[in-house]
Design a protein with these regions (language model features):
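C-terminal-biased regions
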Residues: 1-90
Length: 90
């Protein structure tokens, strides 16, 4: 299934500065390349794992988007549920 690349790209780009702040300047570029190759699940999973590993806060609006994307690409809810604990209000 082909998804709207912009949904993924905009989500990842929202956190470009946060990743740069933890020394992962090229991480969003890596995610963009995965999306352009149609590897939505891998990109989203890597994004979620790195958000957790670096203890980055996620907005509640983005968390809703992530939940829907995870359901669409069959990613285990445990990956995004962990982030929901520390989601920030918008």
């Amino acid at each position: 299934m082909r998804y709207n690349d912009l949904i993924f790209l905009n989500l990842f780009r929202n956190y470009k500065d946060e990743f740069a702040g933890v020394g992962r300047r090229d991480f969003v570029i890596y995610l963009e390349e995965l999306v352009k190759a149609g590897e939505y699940g891998i990109a989203l999973e890597d994004f979620l794992v790195q958000m957790y590993e670096y203890d980055l806060e996620i907005s509640s609006n983005d968390l809703t988007i992530i939940k829907n994307l995870c359901e669409g690409v069959n990613i285990d809810s445990n990956l995004w549920l962990v982030l929901s604990i520390k989601a920030t209000g918008d």
